[in-house]
Amino acid sequence: MAKISRQAYAEMFGPTTGDRLRLADTGLIIEIEKDFTIYGEEVKFGGGKVIRDGMGQSQRMASDCVDTVITNALIVDHWGIVKADIGLKGGRIAAIGKAGNPDIQPGVTIVVGPGTEVIAGEGMIVTAGGIDSHIHFICPQQIEEALMSGVTTMIGGGTGPATGTFATTVTPGPWYMERMLQAADAYPMNIGLLGKGNASQQGPLLEQVEAGAIGLKLHEDWGTTPAAIDTCLSVADATDTQVAIHTDTLNEAGFVEATIAAFKGRTIHTYHTEGAGGGHAPDIIKVCGEANVLPSSTNPTRPYTVNTLDEHLDMLMVCHHLDPSIAEDIAFAESRIRRETIAAEDILHDLGAFSMISSDSQAMGRVGEVIIRTWQTAHKMALQRGKLPGDPNDARGGHDNFRVKRYVAKYTINPALTHGIAHEVGSVEVGKWADLVLWRPAFFGVKPSLILKGGMIAAAAMGDPNASIPTPQPVHYRPMFASAGGALHRSSLTFVSQAALAAGIGERYGLAKTLSAVRGTRTVSKRDMVHNDWQPHVTVDPETYQVVADGQLLTCEPATELPMAQRYFLF
């Protein structure tokens, strides 16, 4: 029998079962767990290759074939790290398995035909599009920045560069909700809006949900009192929508215990749960141990570095409309920035107590760095803490598959579950919207090669349009055809509440995008956070700010150097 070396095989068809590769310039190594393709029957497109008429391409009608096949891709997702062909049809993931022509090939689960386009996935990593669940919609240019980084869904609120939006992720009231949903039609991004949750009567909250909000945001700048928390969660329970909260840094209306009591065991998404982004000082971090709390971080504190503390003060003053000439404003800002809790946040992410990472875009966060900073945190923890249980440390140096699954879940499946959109997005699974990102391994997490929205390429790193081939410089990110015209409306989703969809807001507002209702937000709990469901008992020393979780002191050194940084951004 003819044989081929592993190296030659990997160069031709991509790595296979047992092969290992490094993610970007991090210390993270992954190993392929399974290969769904069949040796000797692999399909590949090109001159003299397999996907040709009567060979790997069948004669079947389009109804029996996929619209797109991504060949020999390496899928990295919360459920596995596997090699497979991926079939897309009707804007969704139709199959993960073996592509080809079933008339002449065995084991084919993805039929390729004359109506099939090919994307070469050999040597490429495929992930689900990222979900950023903490967006201040301050400027529409954020959307392009996020898309080009590999984010395909943005959840948050705002109305543009208004003072309220600088500080809070809120689209307040039915009028603004309608206008912002109309604006969402213009962008190749899945978008869900949060209304203002700060009210002590249910009426003003219900009308925002009925106008299209997928959830409500409680923010201390609007007054996050126990009464407002209770009212907001009552509306959420009645409408199957999520609540996100930025708690009371100054402890004016009560301490963290009062806030937890106001939750009454009901599900809630706690933003920047460490506290530098805002929340009960100094111990908001302890809520990550509650069964009903779904905790996330924002990316300025990801990971803890020698520069983290210095940059936060100025960010805070600007974002929260504070005056540096007022001593109380300075004290407010300084109370939120604690090296001890930021260091503990790194470890709580690594142990799976913090479940999500988001941006806090232009409001103490960088919209294009959710994915980068997630993997920088994973690298730092691997370097400082070694292998996680479940990741082997063998003669070959071991791999980090479990750690990688834990961290990829933080910006894909877990925010999807939290906000009731996991039936549509959040993972590379059959039936889901085909929001996929392709990466060269050396650029993983930093610079994607292709971004697909609803099964069509929406953005790509593309060379000079006047060149004779696609690759000559200048190569930079450019919008592609899924970002244009009517294709944009069919390749991206706008998420709304069930009440709004039933009320026919699509027709009433004149919306062109496909609308999808959120669901299941009130039954999700910490135990549902994939690979990130630890519920430790956390205490914070009020004088030293030292954090202890289940009796273990959580502390680590700040990073002085990180991967995925200047090496990739020289120009």
UniProtKB/Swiss-Prot annotation:
Reaction(s) catalysed by this chain, per the record, are: urea + 2 H2O + H(+) = hydrogencarbonate + 2 NH4(+)
Cofactor(s) the record lists: Ni cation
Q: Which Pfam families match?
A: Amidohydro_1, Urease_alpha
Reported EC number(s) for this entry are 3.5.1.5
Name the pathway.
Nitrogen metabolism; urea degradation; CO(2) and NH(3) from urea (urease route): step 1/1
SUPFAM superfamilies (alphabetical): Composite domain of metallo-dependent hydrolases (SSF51338), Metallo-dependent hydrolases (SSF51556)
Cofactor binding notes: Binds 2 nickel ions per subunit.
| Keywords on record | Cytoplasm, Hydrolase, Metal-binding, Nickel
Give, as one word, the top-level EC class. Answer: hydrolase
UniProt key word Hydrolase: yes
Annotated positions binding Ni(2+) 1: 134, 136, 217, 360
Q: Which residues form the active site?
A: 320 (proton donor)
What post-translational changes are documented for it?
A: Carboxylation allows a single lysine to coordinate two nickel ions.
Which residues hold substrate? Answer: 219
An example of a Gene Ontology cellular component annotation for this protein is: cytoplasm
- What does the subunit comment say? Heterotrimer of UreA (gamma), UreB (beta) and UreC (alpha) subunits. Three heterotrimers associate to form the active enzyme.
Q: Which family does it belong to?
A: Belongs to the metallo-dependent hydrolases superfamily. Urease alpha subunit family.
- Name recorded for this polypeptide: Urease subunit alpha
The organism encoding this protein is Cupriavidus necator (strain ATCC 17699 / DSM 428 / KCTC 22496 / NCIMB 10442 / H16 / Stanier 337)
Recite the lineage of the species.
Answer: Bacteria, Pseudomonadati, Pseudomonadota, Betaproteobacteria, Burkholderiales
